Amino acid sequence: MKFLRLLILYFLFLSFHIYGQSVSFKTYMNPVIPGDHPDPTLTKIGDYFYTSGSSFNPTPKIYRSTDLVHWEVIAQPVSASWPEYGDEPGGGIWGGHMVFYNDVYWHYFGRGGETGGGIMYFSTAEQPEGPWSVPTQVQVPAGLFGLGVDNSIFIDEDTGKWYLLTKAGESNNHLVELGNDGQPTGVVLDLTWLNPGPAPYPYGWAEGPVMWKYKGYYYYSFAQHLYGEQYVMRSDTLTDDESAWTIVGDNIFTGTPGTYNRPNHISPVVMLDDSTSWTIAHSYHSNSNWYAHGRQGLLCQVTYNDQGFPVIQYPPSSPVQAPDLPSSGIPWMVPKSDMFDATTLSPNWSFLGYTSSATYSLEVQEGWLYLEPYGESNTIIQNDGEHNFSLITRVDFEPQSTSHEAGLWIMNGTETHFAKIYSTVNSEGNKAIAFSFEGTKYEVENAIGSIVWLKLVRNEHNMSGYFSPDGSSWTQIGEDINALTLDIKQPPPPDYNAFTGNQQGLYVKGKYAYFDLYIYRDAYTDIIAKNPTNRYGVSSASTYLSGINNDDWAMYAGVEFGGNTDYPKTPVSFGIIASSASSGGIVEVWLDSIDTGTKVTECNISSTDSLDNYQVFTSEMEPVSGRHDVYLKFTGIGTDELFRIRLFKFLTEGDSITSIEDHASRQMPQDFGLMQNYPNPFNSSTKINFTLPKGSKVELIIYNQLGEKVMAIAQGEYSAGTHQLYFFADNLASGIYYYGIKASSFSQMRKMVYLK
């Protein structure tokens, strides 16, 4: 019956595909793979490009693209049920490089972690989508004490030989020749002269080695560490003779750093038919408050200087020229909604560590995901890489204990912080729904029953939780929770919050549950305009999208409209909060691409007399179903800023615009303020809150008793609202310290006491 209803809905909305398409535009914004994509590799095979990298505890993925900008997950080369996988944050799979050699697809990777780590493996397949073989351990050639884990493959097309580039400690760089069976032949090129000891080593770890050829030269590039410099050397002969290689001792990244300001760990460079060259690098966000999104995947163009060495511009904070490549309709790489209508789980979903295949199924109950704990818990996850979205699920769960949970969560890579909403049992033994993060928890009794809708909304670091009996009328649980510690950089120990990136998904604890669907970005929940996935011309201000002029646009990826049995919603109108001090303009709403996609509505924005005076504007639209990348194209006349946008959403029949109006008038802090740190006195770390009635450039400095600057814990633009920072004092002496803030014309100083 479910299939029949889906078929009817498909024909009803035939003109709007369930999975929309995006074309390649002339420009793009990094990251092209938001969220964790560390140690990336890149391979061109035919008309396709493939990338993979370190996944650590989550199951690894292979991504495919035709244009280097839009990527899709096509396979998992290592199964979560592989007995050697382990279950250790920061363990699991290190590196990962898929290549095509001798008519076979090979995926080489390292097994990291404290237990069972430091070993290289490969798996094989007849096609990149799999199925992939059980991994085979790579044998260590005589004379080498190990192969390391952060490695890659180089195929010399001129000789037909292929090599494993190994890194097993600071000084141990080698090129290991491989045979047709994927195992070392015994021929090893020794590059230990590259980064000789003892410490300090000239190039740090000299890790993540990659190679490529260009105009007859071999290029060997390596990273200083997981962030930092990127170095390169070249030779016209593939040899381990030091005298044959010329090393560039400076960072090959140059220019002005942007939002992602410490890129390195580049992939092998690929050259296109138009002779342009490209690589994928990784980098943290420049704002340490977003470090825990991980080392994100950045597409960078490579040029060569007069001496023939590669040069890469730091990725700017603005759009850049895209490769001249055709798009195949792949949407932007953000987490994918899933109605669980297939018989096998999509490769978009990863597990955490070793997970028995008996703990999940899409066939126990048609159209639902069955998930049971493996040990204490179980989860399916995707990258958490954006700043605003709304997660929705419908869960069928019969908890019998306060330790039983089933719901949605966002977690950090070290698996120590969890923002979650879930079905459970309260201390009185009654069914309940809870929303929590760290020590803050809100709970209400569940009067709906075993099947309940849950929604978790992220608006930057603020989380909010909701529940519903029908997926239409939602009730918030408690208040918003500031989850900054989920996202912020934290030094080791205890968390090392930046090494592995945040994840989001579904989870169970203590007992099995059924999940009917997973929605990533709900069309009917506020979509914050300042956080587009891709954009042209416009810019992001503290609380709004600004700099809007004629022919500018902004894209919001992976918007789920439903229109199916699982989520039977259909929009009838479009609502937007905007302001204009000019004659205004028009917002065109396109699905999947501009001009070649489908325009579903036009919304006229008239003057509101002031850019600070926001009003609600609406327009009718045709029905839409499925998941789409939504583009807002802006048109108008004149050179002045046409308008500003705070948020938008789509409305169903009978929906009220009230929620949008409420947001427009939402109370922001009325004054600047700096709160007393908590706890005070403190040991190791303390929280410092401050409020901003408007977006401002903030400087928050720690001083010692002599008034000398110790460190800055905030320097940069912050949006209006309440903000929370963490101050870590592990390296300081006990005593009295002061902290002061400057924001706009406001300044204030407070005292705190640190006791080791």
Report the location of each language-model feature.
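Bacterial Sec-dependent N-terminal signal peptides
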Residues: 1-22, 661
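Short hydrophobic "helix-edge" motifs at membrane interfaces and signal-peptide entry regions
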Residues: 6, 57, 669-673
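Carbohydrate-active catalytic/glycan-binding domains of CAZyme proteins
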Residues: 21-569, 573-588, 592-596, 611-620, ...
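Hydrophobic aliphatic residue packing
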Residues: 42, 153, 395, 545-547, ...
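Short, compositionally biased serine/threonine- and acidic-rich segments at solvent-exposed termini, linkers
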Residues: 655-665
